[in-house]
Amino acid sequence: VDLLSQDGGGFGCAHLDASFATSDGPGGLRTAIERLCDEAEAHARAGIGLLVLDDGGVSDTRVPVPALLAVGAVHHRLVAAGLRMETSLIVSADEARDVHYIACMLGYGADAISPGLALETVAHEADENPDSEMGGPEAQQRLQSAMEDGVLKVMSKMGISTVDSYRGAQIFEVIGLGAEVVDVCFAGTPSVVGGIGWTELGEDCLARHEQYRLGDGGYYRALKKAGSEYHTHNDPVVKALNELQAAHFLQAAIRNGSDEAYDRFSNLVNSRPPTELHDLLELVPAGPPLPLEEVEPARAITRRFSTGAMSHGALSREAHETLAEGMNLIGGMSNCGEGGESRRRFITRGQPKGDKNSRIKQIASGRFGVTPEYCAYADELNIKMAQGSKPGEGGQIPGAKVSEEIAKLRHTQPGIGLISPPPHHDIYSIEDLAQLIYDLKQVNGLADVSVKLVAEDNVGTIAAGVAKALAEVIHISGANGGTGASPLMSIKHAGLPWELGVAETQRALMENGLRDRVRVRMDGGLLTGRDVLMAALLGADEYSFGTAAMIAEGCIMARACHKDTCPTGVATQRPHLRAKFTGTPEGVAAYMLFIAEELRKGLAALGLRTLDEAIGRVECLRQRNMDDPRANTMDLTPLITLPSDPEAARHFVKPVEIQRPRSSLGDRLLADTYRHIWDGGDVELTYKIANSDRTVGAALGGALALEFGDRPPPGTACVRFEGSAGQSFAAFITHGIEFELVGEANDYVGKAMAGGRIVIRPPDNDAGDPVLMGNTCLYGATGGDVFIAGSVGERFGV
């Protein structure tokens, strides 16, 4: 800044004091923001090219203005005045110390950021630590590199390549700030439920400033500030004890079948301080209470339950199978997550006891383990577009957890870390998503297809598109969904509460006349029957449990999932630790039944007989009047507003006929070849094919995989096609199938093929140098041979 502001540099520079006097009280913050905006506008009009928002004037009597509020307000003032392109904003702030804060300041207009205190701190630690292998300058360089890498990661999650494109883009959503603040500092950013204003923020600034003074060292009460005296029962310890106690109560209830033990667990959760949005809501009866025997049975309710998508790899084989078997005992569903599943589990499907087959099979962006056989043994195929706690990121598993067994299931090499890309390479539009849904319904015509979305602003529009793309289930994942597989920065700062996503999805589906043909599922930290009841009243048909289901099989929240050192054998691949696993399918089933029974009591108290009667009944909810004035600043009206058409369907009724589309040529091929292959015959056929014939071969591949698995069938089918094939030609084919296409094919040729042969060549009279296939061909393919006498499109063989 000093160099740029020299006379020869061509830039004028002005330092703006980002602080206010303690004597101004809480109102001083708003006054300081207004002053900064006025000064910035005046300097910009005077031709000053560099404006530095500087909190260096902080003292005993001067309080720092939060840098994000300052830069956002100044940026928007300059934009409104038409002056933003005339000057650069530089932030010199001691509170800029982590990636999220820096990403936010860039996103709200900062051109450069100087994290002074962070740089001084790491340099001091490096210089003063006798064991340090680096000096202060190197430590500062490493911090800068780490922050830059973190910002690049944030940009990549949003699909942005340059800082110039990210700066001022405001790709954020606000939770807990009122309109009076948002309109000034974050104008245009969605803030659905409001929250605190300038007065409360000013009080927080003053409270933090008080902590800079010497005096109270925490001798009489526990303080969170660094350097204060340690208290045995400080807040973090008490919180951890509560969590451990909650886990103990739950596991005791499961072991003993004790309603009393479960009630202790439930009361501990339901009586917590406001933690989630639905904690700010209370129940309003729809009618007089009903006898419990008039409410639908627990076994009918548990059919709506599922486990979160946790892979065999993230979890040990024992833990993964226990979840599947436990859910199958009660008619629920387990989601196998991304990474495949062993065939020895497929063949247990339908057994009254010992059914270890995961009824939901996930299709994620890495396509690990996705084969025709994998799809054929699913009751539901789940397309993961995003994960609640880390939207914009793909799944990943560290190399230490990729054992021989895991590598075999995922068709990769042991010891190598696996990271799925943020996008599906065959989905770049809602039409592409519709095509994948169509593909999956060809390979397994009996399975439902679900699409997993994250709670975010405007998710309702996306959900409506998913319904029109003919999915049966729309899965809304909240910010607490999938935290065990997410980096800390994403857990803390990405995703939205499920309540916002479910409410908006419900509203959009009803307004578009789509609600009765799809089921809405949600996840995001469900623990008790009351949580489920709240989700139902906001509009969810089905409910998914992640962390709680793991606790039910022995997880003690050691938070070592990523280290492969789980002490209870739940989330590790190490044999000696897996041997310590003590969970049982009966324990998982018992927990789900406890939840269902608590839910039945809640329905009875509301005067409702079935969950269908409860779904979408927002009139049975109202905002609580809390003891905490700050909690009362939030406005949950958008969540509980009655639909514009009160007679419209509020829950799933039945699918429409078009939700089971078929490929006429694909079905004809199946009918003409399957019996011959099964009997050991070799059949040769020829068909004309047009670009309206999509996903030809998937139905045959799925049928053969269901019967023969990954083994070659007794017979073969050699099929010649002539013409221009539609999308997903020869997708999901397997051993025993040979396709020859004389002509050309669209996108996705050979997607997820596991065997067989594909030959594509131009007609004999072709002029030469032909382009024979479109984009994303052989995506996720794990076996077979392909011969192409020409060029292909992009993203080939991913």
Question: What residue spans do the PLM features occupy?
Answer:
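Long, distal/terminal scaffolding or interaction modules
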Residues: L577, A589, L603-L606, I615, ...
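Alpha-helix-loop-beta-strand connector modules within alpha/beta enzyme cores
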Residues: V63-L89, R142-D149, K153, L436-V443, ...
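Flexible glycine/proline-rich, aromatic-decorated loop/lid segments
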Residues: V71-R77, H100-M134, Q141, N357, ...
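Active-site cores of enzymes that catalyze phosphoryl transfer or operate on phosphate-rich substrates
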Residues: V1-T31, R35-R45, C375-I430, Q435, ...
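Gly-rich Lys/Arg/Thr-decorated short loops/hinges at beta-loop-alpha junctions or inter-strand turns
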Residues: G8-G28, L53-S59, R84, T302-T307, ...
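Catalytic cores of alpha/beta
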Residues: A96-G109, D457-A469, L527-A540
